[in-house]
Curated annotation (Swiss-Prot):
Keywords for this protein: Membrane, Mitochondrion, Mitochondrion inner membrane, Transit peptide
Superkingdom of origin: Eukaryota
Compartment annotation: Mitochondrion inner membrane
Role description: Has a complex stabilizing activity in the assembly of the mitochondrial F1-F0 complex.
Protein's recorded name: ATP synthase mitochondrial F1 complex assembly factor 1
Gene it is expressed from: atpaf1
Protein family (similarity comment): Belongs to the ATP11 family.
Membrane protein topology class: Peripheral membrane protein
GO-annotated biological processes: mitochondrial proton-transporting ATP synthase complex assembly
Primary location class: mitochondrion
GO cellular component terms given for this protein: mitochondrial inner membrane; mitochondrion
Source organism per UniProt: Danio rerio
């Protein structure tokens, strides 16, 4: 269980991030698919919280918020109170120091409990006949890999060994980052956390409402089994299709390449700042970088 004060601090800064999100508008990207409501969830009346409901993704996670308020009303009210305490925090800045510690603790717990609905200890051998591909070249394996996953509702990639070494080396010192997914109403923020060769994503509002129970919604698997002999690293993913589409998963994967694999040091410096100088981190800088790279739409700032 997390320390209460650190949890509260994390909740406060996440509230500030969402005020920043609401200032950005974009009309070219389709919205997330609303989550399906499990039949066993009990319906009950819930007091409306205007500030929370102003978040454009409130409806997407409303059922999870209802469940939290029903099962842990004191914790729910405490989080809302902490959200109010820092309304004066400057837009564009966030208290990430507490948040980074918060996500590290989540990773530790998630490593012990696993992620519901996702394959545990997924190996390359469970996907590919490793004996068969030993005689094939890296180019031939690349073609097989991409053809196989082109028929699946997921994403895949073949990463050059040198590129992966850069990405993974940086991930060791900077395992956590905040990603911005373009949506109809601004951007939805996702937290990406490396765990070995896996990269776990969960939406920021999901962490905010679910706390330590927030599950991964997208996992990128990187297989290094053939890196030494074939000079390639194979990647594929699993996702919760109720919350993340294939198109959106590809956008997040592209951002990993952008922020962790870029030769432009100013780009990776955002990741370093998030991890090592969180008090200086500006989430709007992430959005600006996406626009400059062409991954995100044009951003109008006031």
């Amino acid at each position: 269980m997390w320390d209460g004060e650190k949890m509260a601090a994390a909740m406060v800064q996440m509230s500030c991030l969402y005020r920043g999100m609401l200032a950005v508008r974009n009309h070219g990207i389709r919205p997330l698919i609303p989550g399906l409501v499990p039949s066993h969830f009990r319906a009950f009346s819930m007091k409306k919280e205007p500030e929370l409901e102003e978040n454009p993704y409130y409806s997407k996670y409303e059922e999870k918020i209802r469940k939290l308020r029903s099962s842990k009303p004191q914790e729910y009210e405490s989080r809302l109170e902490k959200r109010t305490e820092l309304k004066t925090e400057p837009l564009g800045r966030s208290r990430q120091a507490e948040f980074v510690k918060y996500m590290e603790k989540e990773l530790d717990k998630r490593g012990k409990d696993g992620d519901g609905g996702f394959t545990k200890d997924k190996t390359l051998g469970s996907i590919l006949n490793l004996e068969m591909v030993q005689e094939k070249s890296g180019a031939e394996i690349t073609e097989l890999w991409m053809q196989y996953f082109s028929k699946k509702d997921t994403i895949s990639a073949v990463i050059p060994s040198s590129t992966f070494d850069v990405i993974f080396g940086r991930a060791k010192s900077c395992p956590t980052f905040l990603y911005a997914l373009p949506q109809n109403e601004g951007y939805e923020f996702f937290v990406g956390q490396w765990a070995g060769n896996e990269l776990h994503f969960t939406s920021l509002i999901n962490v905010q409402t679910m706390g330590e129970n927030a599950p991964s919604q997208l996992i990128l698997y990187h297989y290094t089994d053939l890196q030494k002999d074939k000079d390639i690293v194979l990647m594929t993913a699993e996702m919760d299709s109720k919350f993340v589409t294939v198109h959106q998963a590809q956008c997040l994967a592209n951002q990993v390449q952008l922020f962790y694999g870029s030769q432009r040091l100013e780009t990776f410096r955002l990741v370093e700042t998030f991890n090592h100088k969180p008090e200086e981190f500006k989430h709007m800088a992430v959005i600006a970088e996406l626009e400059q790279s062409g991954i995100g739409p044009a951003v109008t700032t006031k």
